[in-house]
From Swiss-Prot:
Its cofactor is Mg(2+). This is Enolase. Keywords: Cytoplasm, Glycolysis, Lyase, Magnesium, Metal-binding. It comes from the Eukaryota. Mg(2+) binds at D251, E301, D328. GO terms for biological process: glycolytic process. SMART domains: Enolase_C, Enolase_N. Homodimer. InterPro entries: Enolase, Enolase-like_C_sf, Enolase-like_N, Enolase_C, Enolase_CS, Enolase_N. Its EC number is 4.2.1.11. The active site is at E216 (proton donor), K353 (proton acceptor). It is an enzyme of class 4 (lyase). It comes from Ricinus communis. GO terms for cellular component: phosphopyruvate hydratase complex.
Amino acid sequence: MAITIVSVRARQIFDSRGNPTVEADIKLSDGHLARAAVPSGASTGIYEALELRDGGSDYLGKGVSKAVENVNSIIGPALIGKDPTEQTALDNFMVQELDGTVNEWGWCKQKLGANAILAVSLALCKAGAHVKGIPLYKHIANLAGNKNLVLPVPAFNVINGGSHAGNKLAMQEFMILPVGASSFKEAMKMGAEVYHHLKSVIKKKYGQDATNVGDEGGFAPNIQENKEGLELLKTAIAKAGYTGKVVIGMDVAASEFYGSDKTYDLNFKEENNDGSQKISGEALKDLYKSFASEYPIVSIEDPFDQDDWEHYSKLTSEIGEKVQIVGDDLLVTNPKRVEKAIQEKACNALLLKVNQIGSVTESIEAVRMSKRAGWGVMASHRSGETEDTFIADLSVGLATGQIKTGAPCRSERLAKYNQLLRIEEELGAEAVYAGAKFRTPVEPY
C-alpha cells in the first residue's frame, strides 16, 4: 500500500540567536516522522519572500505563532492523504493554491508566510526520501535530475563585520575556502587549523576579548578597515602552512551601507559620521579590483546594492573570469531575478538560501537556471540557524560545489559540516570533492 501523509504539525522553536522560528513534523502512514526547521537572516534582501512574524510585544515582535497556525489549520489539513514523494506538485499546491499571493517577482508567500511553507516543504522532502528508501541527498538529486553527487568546498566565515558584528568593519564576512584539499574531510582539517591559527593571531594583536565569536562563529576583532581583515586571513593561512591551498572569499552585504545619495558608506556603523568614507559605486568597484590583485580572493558576494545592476555588470565583466561574483540580496534565490541577472550578465554565481524563496521546488529551479548559465552556486545557511542539516544534503544533491555555513565553531554551524562528513563517508569510493572545480563541478542538468 502506498505510504501517505497522516498529519502535519508545526511548533515554534528557537534559532541560534534566541529568536522564534518554525519547525514542522510530518507523520506518515507507516509511522515514520519527518521533521524540519527553518532559519532566518539578519541582513535580509528586500526582495525575499515574506517571513511571517507576529509583531506586537511578545518576543519583541518576532513570534511565529501565525505561521505555526497557518501550518496547523491551513496547510496541514490540505496535505493529509497525499503522497510525500510528489515534492513538485505539493510545493506548487502550497505556493500557488493555498497561498496564491503574487508580486512582480513571482509567488511571494504573503498570506501564509515563506517560513510556514518552507518548514513543510523541507519536511516533505525528508519524508519523500524515507518513502523512497534513499538518503536525502540522493532524493534531492533525483528531484533535480542531477546524476552527479559532489561534496562542496566549505566557505568558512571566520571574520565577521557588517550587521553581524559590533566592530567598525563595513564588509560582513571574510571567508576561507580550502580548494586545495583532496576530500571534504581534509577541507575540514584545513579550515579548523586555519581557524585556530587565526584565533591566536587575533589574540596576540587585539587581546583576548577579540576572540569572542559572532553569530556565525567567526571572530569580530576591532578591525578598523577591510584590508586589515584580508591581511589577518593571509597571515593565518600562511601560519597553518596552507598558502595556495586555502583561498579567500568575501561577503560584503553592500545593500546595508548604500545610501539614498547612491554612495556606499564604508563607515556606516558610526552614527552621524562626517561622510568622509562615502564612495561611489565606481570607486568601490576599483577597491575590489585592488583587493583581488593583492590577495587570493576567489569569491565576492553582494559587492553592491541589490538594485545597483550597473556596477554588478561592470565588476562581473572586469574580473568575473578570475573571481566569482555572487548574488545574494540581488537574486534572493528567486528564479525571476536569476533570469534578469543572466540577461544583464550582472553576476556569475547564485547564493542558494531556501528560506529566501520558501520552497524546495523553487530553490531547485533557481539552481538549474544558474548552472545552465554557466554560473557557480553556493548553498548557504542564515545567521539565525537551527540544528537542522537539510542544506548539507541539498548541497551534495544539487552538486552546488560550495557551501557556506559559518566558522568551524558553534554547534548549529558544525551540524551541517558534520553531516557532510557523514555523507562523504557513506559515499565511500564514489565520493567526489569539488576542490578547484568549485565553480562548475558538474555539467548543467
